[in-house]
């Protein structure tokens, strides 16, 4: 199962308390399984069937580029973080 992490800001926004192990072969199924554990969490993570604008998904240290279709391995570490902007 993948380990899913949120930063402090996301924990407060979602009520998510820390790290959780969930099954899933891609981000879409990981989020669906998170929704079973934490009803309503998909409203913070998903917008129009993709990752919420302003949110980044990091899988095993790599920033995802294809949204909910990103592959997740059995032992992956998944982080949902607010996207960083710069100028």
Question: Predicted regions span which residues?
Answer:
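Ubiquitin-like/PB1-type beta-grasp interaction modules and other compact soluble beta-rich domains
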Residues: 1-86
